[in-house]
Amino acid sequence: VWNGDKSDDAQLGKLETLPFTVLFVDGNHENFDALNEYPIEQWHGGKVHRIRPHVLHLMRGQAFELQGRTFFTMGGAQSHDIADGILDMDSPDFYKRYDALRRNRGQFRINHISWWQEELPSNEEYEHARQTLERLNWQVDYIITHCAPTAIQRKISASFKPDKLTDFLEEIRTRS
């Protein structure tokens, strides 16, 4: 899930040996090219990527019923370490820019290597999330996310800027 190659196997193998099922939502630095290669299945009422038999990625905007409780999931997050930009390896000046940014300790990421546009939910994922919450009358027992709603994020650190996802999570917080 991290590199999208055989190097992931050892770490995923360790997770698979744990005496429980590992569940996770995605964040902002996932390898979405690799993650989206895994099969999608229905699991406890919502969609998952099955990474291993006991390692599951809980997809965005889903509701899961576990032990009589409802869990709503909304992964994703805005990268805060890209002040100097996102580089494209296909750009003719990639190596020049990369070397300069590394020398100056720049804050940057590389498209489809360390940054993916999918770090934030798509409009379709927001729409699906709203439909899921409407079906549940915006009442769930637990909300699992990677980032916090805007009001909570402000209490944690003023350096984090609100974005569409944190505002959406704030809407959920105030409506639930």
Where are these regions (language model features)?
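Core catalytic region of metal-dependent phosphoesterases/phosphodiesterases
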Residues: 1-66, 158, 162-165, 169, ...
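Active-site-proximal loop/helix segment associated with metal-binding centers of metalloenzymes
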Residues: 53, 67-159
